[in-house]
């Protein structure tokens, strides 16, 4: 039976993702229809509900449904995903989230280990490297070399006999630093007070108090007297305190493992990335431990055996240290006939070329060519992946770069690498502001990559503020009209042309262009930087103007952060406001972080004649059922734990008796839970006048509103804030400090086009108030508003690291001598 070609197949009718009645967070029964296999951009002011719709509803439900296809046992190892609050979700496909979360905090995690490149490179050296030293494990700094022997029972001629067997695993980890690349020296005076005994609290290590479990273990170990000052210990006793191997002991009738202070600290503290530590732990590590490059492996993390094997004169440590754009060229040349030594030597320099010439004889060259031809598919895969790094604007990185040191934007683009060459189609890719950290020159390349994913038959959902990316969308969903409780509605859905004519805030500001600043401030002094050479900086000498707004520009990887964070941030009077995670428990919120809760609690206590502690969910006022958490965490053994709203307090966190106390009179009176449910803008009005006026609280709320956080709720968990929101929260806190120089790292991150003007006004107020403001930024509106610009480049990595321009924005536009100058000129129409 034949079917007419004009008749569409039933399967072709499922070309939409339908969302009906979405109510996550501030969404107000949102209903949208998103076309599949198209690029859809979600826009709107900060806090309008974009992430709630895209991440908390569409992507979350897709991932939850996929997780449910696995067995209960496997689900126990997966994150718990709650049902989104929505009436209907239809037409979902597999969602892959490419977010800005930083990659791995482990000290051994690098760009190479976080992608497939490191593994492919290890296989290449295990197959082609000379001399041959072992399998791919022999080149991994995460695998230690171990050997052993023992007796095994085997059956021979009908009898069981014991035979001695040996085994050996050849790993690539440097035995001295255990693959960390650095060794540590301990300042013992920071570990303990030698004039005190253990029971008197001699140990000054975090969490080692005499009342704590660790303190009890050391006091009752029996390896040294716990009641005598440490400076009276004998040498064996001191060795036991500091270096004792793990030993089972009994303390207070409980079997525990005792281990010396230094190995225990190395395992519990030094195995973590420094930036992932809690502030008090980080302060202790900085105080007690001095890190230096491992003298055995010279920071490469690899054993001498792993470093002895070479391909064309290059060992794996040298390959990983190359800039990725150079490594891609070196891999490409391996496929070429040997004899191109002159060309090949240009990759790493003349000295390396000479080394290769001496390493490879005529016979060795033929042998290498034969070996390389046997791994051609591997080389092709390596080339493709490394070329993707270059295409995505990350060619300036190296594979040995710690992954924890990548910015949120760099981490997001690194995660994109694995998807660019994927053979999957009909997948939904979800991106959270992919242009973060990108120079205008690099945004075009990012747009091309998004379009490539779409053209392979995938659905691409992008949350974005940059007009350069909004305009490439096939479909636009604009949320608003405001933020928080004033948002959560779809104010426009359709094409980019329709958005321009829609009259929404996004539509009105889509084609905004800032003009060059006319009234420039005169610097009052200069901050001298001499011989800056960290990372890719080339002995940079620069005078950073004081008393003005200085914007530091340049393509990604040009050396901006290295210059400012490496040479300015550590000086006296400098306040650095970055986008790093804010450490705290899941109970932490803007009210606790900013100190706002303290004057609020005192105001409640004074108005009701009770103690302030009653108005803390972490203290006397906590709900007795959930202990002030607002939710009950249930451990389901092999299945994932479940968090359910507390039935007693209904998520309000406080005891019912506390909620009877109110602040204010009449209809305006509020209890403490209602205050914490307010947005910053609502609380600013509440505490700004009348019976509820609290000046100390109002000052903090004014600063929060000034930095564009008026939509954030006072009791909102800090873990729900984006990188840009975290930075603005830190800025609000630091605005109350006495520092004279403020350093801001891309403060426009997460800001809507309409909010950038508010940020510029805030920066002006800081400078007019006597502060010096240094901003690392890519946004052309901020560049145009600067008093002075310092542009680094001309390229990224070893192609950058130089100051290519110093002067006013008008001078930069007039010269157009740099990439930044060209794009700023195009932006202002110069």
Q: What does each model-identified segment do?
A:
Residues 1-830:
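Conserved phosphate-binding elements of NTP-dependent enzyme cores
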């Amino acid at each position: 039976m034949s079917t007419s070609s004009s008749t569409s197949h039933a399967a072709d009718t499922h070309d939409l993702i339908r969302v009906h009645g979405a109510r996550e967070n501030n969404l107000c029964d949102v209903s949208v229809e998103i076309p599949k296999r198209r690029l859809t951009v979600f826009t709107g002011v900060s806090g309008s509900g974009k992430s709630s719709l895209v991440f908390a509803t569409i992507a979350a439900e897709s991932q939850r449904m996929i997780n449910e296809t696995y067995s209960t046992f496997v689900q126990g190892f997966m994150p718990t995903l709650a049902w989104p609050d929505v009436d209907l979700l239809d037409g979902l496909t597999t969602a892959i989230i490419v977010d800005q979360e930083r990659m791995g905090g482990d000290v051994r995690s690098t760009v190479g280990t976080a992608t497939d490149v490191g593994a492919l490179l290890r296989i290449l050296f295990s197959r082609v490297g000379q001399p041959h030293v072992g399998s791919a494990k022999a080149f991994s700094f995460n695998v230690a070399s171990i050997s052993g022997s023992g007796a095994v029972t085997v059956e021979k001629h009908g009898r069981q006999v014991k035979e001695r067997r040996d085994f050996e695993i050849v790993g690539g980890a440097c035995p001295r630093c255990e693959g960390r690349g650095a060794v540590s020296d301990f300042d013992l005076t920071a570990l303990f007070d030698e004039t005190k005994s253990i029971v008197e609290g001699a140990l000054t290590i975090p969490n080692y108090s005499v009342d704590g479990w660790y303190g009890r273990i050391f006091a009752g170990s029996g390896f040294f007297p716990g009641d005598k000052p440490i400076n009276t210990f004998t040498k064996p006793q001191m060795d036991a305190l500091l270096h004792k191997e793990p030993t089972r002991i009994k303390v207070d009738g409980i079997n525990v493992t005792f281990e010396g202070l230094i190995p225990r600290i190395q395992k519990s503290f030094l195995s973590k990335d420094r930036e992932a530590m809690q502030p008090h732990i980080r302060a202790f590590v900085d105080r007690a431990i001095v890190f230096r490059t491992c003298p055995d492996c010279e920071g490469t993390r690899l054993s001498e055996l792993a470093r002895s094997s070479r391909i064309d004169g290059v060992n794996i440590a040298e390959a990983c240290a190359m800039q990725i754009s150079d490594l891609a060229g070196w891999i490409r040349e391996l496929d070429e006939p040997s004899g191109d030594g002159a060309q090949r030597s240009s990759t790493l320099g003349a000295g390396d070329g000479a080394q290769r010439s001496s390493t490879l004889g005529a016979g060795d060259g033929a042998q290498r060519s034969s070996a390389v031809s046997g791994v051609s598919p591997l080389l092709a895969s390596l080339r493709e992946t490394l070329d993707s790094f270059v295409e995505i604007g990350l060619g300036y990185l190296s594979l040995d770069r710690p992954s924890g040191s990548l910015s949120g934007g760099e981490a997001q683009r690194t995660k994109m690498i694995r998807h660019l060459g994927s053979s999957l189609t009909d997948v939904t890719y979800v991106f959270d502001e992919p242009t973060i950290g990108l120079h205008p020159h690099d945004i075009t390349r990012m747009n091309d990559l998004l379009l490539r994913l779409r053209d392979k038959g995938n659905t691409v959902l992008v949350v974005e503020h940059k007009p350069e990316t909004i305009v490439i969308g096939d479909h636009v969903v604009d949320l608003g009209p405001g933020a928080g409780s004033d948002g959560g509605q779809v104010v426009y859905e359709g094409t980019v042309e329709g958005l321009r004519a829609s009259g929404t805030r996004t539509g009105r500001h889509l084609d905004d262009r800032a003009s060059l600043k006319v009234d420039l401030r005169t610097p009052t002094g200069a901050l001298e930087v001499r011989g800056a050479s960290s990372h890719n900086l080339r002995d940079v000498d620069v005078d950073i103007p004081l008393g003005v707004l200085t914007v530091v520009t340049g393509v990604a990887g040009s050396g901006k952060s290295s210059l400012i964070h490496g040479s300015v941030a550590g000086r006296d009077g400098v306040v650095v406001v970055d986008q790093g995670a804010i450490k705290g428990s899941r109970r932490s919120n803007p009210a606790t972080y900013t100190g706002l809760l303290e004057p609020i609690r005192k105001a409640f206590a004074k108005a009701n004649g009770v103690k302030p502690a009653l108005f803390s969910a972490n203290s006397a006022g906590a709900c007795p059922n959930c202990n002030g958490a607002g939710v009950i965490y249930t451990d389901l053994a092999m299945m994932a734990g479940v968090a359910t709203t507390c039935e007693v307090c209904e998520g309000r966190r406080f005891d019912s008796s506390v909620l009877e106390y109110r602040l204010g009179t009449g209809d305006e009176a509020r209890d403490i839970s209602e205050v914490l449910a307010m947005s910053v803008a609502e609380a600013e009005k509440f505490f700004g006048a009348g019976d509820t006026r609290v000046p100390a609280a109002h000052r903090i709320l004014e600063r929060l509103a000034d930095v564009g956080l008026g939509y954030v709720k006072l009791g909102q968990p800090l873990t729900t804030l984006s990188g840009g929101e975290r930075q603005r929260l830190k800025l609000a806190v630091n605005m109350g400090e006495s520092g004279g120089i403020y350093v801001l790292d891309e403060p426009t991150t997460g800001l809507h086009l309409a909010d950038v003007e508010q940020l510029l006004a805030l920066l002006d107020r800081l400078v007019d108030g006597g502060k010096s403001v240094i901003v690392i930024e890519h946004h052309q509106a901020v560049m145009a508003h600067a008093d002075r610009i310092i542009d680094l480049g001309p390229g990224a990595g070893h192609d950058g690291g130089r100051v290519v321009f110093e002067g006013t924005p008008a001078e930069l536009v007039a010269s157009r001598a740099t990439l930044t100058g060209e794009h700023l000129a195009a932006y202002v129409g110069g």
